[in-house]
Amino acid sequence: MSCSSALEKFINSYLNSYQNALSELPRYYPMGVASPCIAQTFDEQSEDAVFWQPVKREPAGDFDNVASALAITLHQDINHFYASFFSAPLQFNSPWGEGELLLAWSLEDFEYLQQNIIGHLLMKQKLKQAPTWFIGVLSDGDTMITVENDTGAVWIEVPGEVPKQQLAPSIAEFITQLSPRITPAIKPVQEVDPQWQHPGIWQRMKLMWRDLTHRSRK
């Protein structure tokens, strides 16, 4: 099964799980950021959670600009995973605990994502480590789920360290080991920094990057 097929299958299972358990779509706090995923009338001034569902991108996006900027060949799965859908983070249960798959909420969020992946790849170069790029986090908030760029294998990675535990030889095989986790919408803590005024998991990624940068300076 391809990465895009595995992701689409998980998304369908995710929506079905919410319908079976709650007879509704999942909810999410967009924090004033519009998205094609929002499945109701949207008020940018409202602080309430909204019903949402993943939306397939037409046409799909790509990371050609990232590859060109860094003069690197990116594994094809980065496009299949990140550029096929707009979506809020997808909560999951797994053999390694609870976690979230990171996806872009909107085109603006996709651009933030690309900037963060560039930053991650540059930091790996600075640390003289093999290139990886992240696709999620585990619930402890201290570990990323990353993809080894050269092979496409999925690993657990602590910011600033070399990945030590391989979870699956590919994203597709990793996703097949996940099950949807039904959870109430959790309102993210707002921060003052205007560069981080987009919703979802990125504020957690910011804290992880602070830790990574601190370690690299030691």
UniProtKB/Swiss-Prot annotation:
GO terms for cellular component: cytoplasmic side of plasma membrane. It is a peripheral membrane protein. Transmembrane segments: none annotated. Keywords: Cell inner membrane, Cell membrane, Membrane. Belongs to the Syd family. InterPro entries: Syd (IPR009948), Syd_sf (IPR038228). It is found in: Cell inner membrane. Signal peptide: none annotated. Pfam families: Syd (PF07348). It comes from the Bacteria. Interacts with the SecY protein in vivo. May bind preferentially to an uncomplexed state of SecY, thus functioning either as a chelating agent for excess SecY in the cell or as a regulatory factor that negatively controls the translocase function. The keyword Cell membrane applies. This is Protein Syd.
